[in-house]
Amino acid sequence: VFQKLSRYLGIEEIAGTFPMEAGGVNSMIPIVVAASQGIPIVDCDGMGRAFPELRMTTFNLGGVSSTPMAITDEKGNIGISETISNKWTERLARVQTVEMGASSLISIYPATGRQLKDHGIHGIVTLSEKIGEVIRSNDLEEATKLEKLLKLIDGLELFQGKMMDVIRKVEGGFNFGEATLEGLNQDAGSTMKIYFQNENLIAEKDGSVITMTPDLICMVDLETLMPVTTEALKYGKRIRVLALPCHEKWQTKEGINTVGPRYFGYDLDYIPLKELAIKGGHKHV
């Protein structure tokens, strides 16, 4: 699909590639592509995290077109799309992905070096590598590892708990859900709910919202700190809920309109993570 887009653009050799989001398998595929094609991977992405829609990128905020876009499936079907807006790119790609069996590979947001410099979130590949090094280190005690991780990501630990219930539904090609955790250790007696649409969007502790999109809500294993994705949530799983601030590009008016809580249907005005922590939360989702 990468080569198909290159031919469509009339470019003999693409100068490099980059991940569209720093989350899940989508952060790794560009590394494989770069290695197989013998080209550099640029140390940036378009989200600084993961979001459920293709238009939810800082490139979109900067007016960069997401198309031409190439899309393929495991059967070998390949399509090229040129759309009138990034919103239409998301709609058409979502429909095609559903028809392809709910899984597809895409090559998207062809961009110049200047566009990457102006609109990308820089250093995200390097940061991801450093996070992985901390999590996988065997010479650190659990408390030291957590402290080092939180310092690296400028994050907070929100909650320690055991997964008690997960409600899921698939709608419009998205995985919606609500996870309920029962507090452990210092959080014993408290309850946390996490609402997600592919990615975690809202964290609520004892009825008060304590973190909201576009700030990041990350669930990790209580002991190993290995990431726990929404797909891997199951009863009995012991989890730490961490949070870290989003990139400043998302805190603009256009950024909040694109990925803030109201876009996802929550009756909340965005309050930054650390400001919300000082206030002690925001009542009701």
Question: Could you tell me what each predicted segment is?
Answer:
Residues G132-G183:
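Oxyanion-binding "anion nests"
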Residues E13-I14, M100-T112, L140-Q160, E248-E254:
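Flexible, glycine/charged-enriched surface loops at secondary-structure junctions
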Residues E12-G23, I41:
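A short, small-residue-rich loop immediately preceding and capping a beta-strand
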Residues V166-V285:
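C-terminal non-catalytic interaction/assembly regions of soluble proteins
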Residues M56-Q96:
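A structural-propensity feature for long, helix-poor, extended segments
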Residues M20-I31, R49-P52:
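Short glycine/serine/threonine-rich phosphate/pyrophosphate-binding segments
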Residues A35-R55:
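Short, acidic/small-residue loops that bind anionic groups at enzyme active sites
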Residues V1-A15:
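Glycine-rich oxoanion-binding loops at beta->alpha junctions
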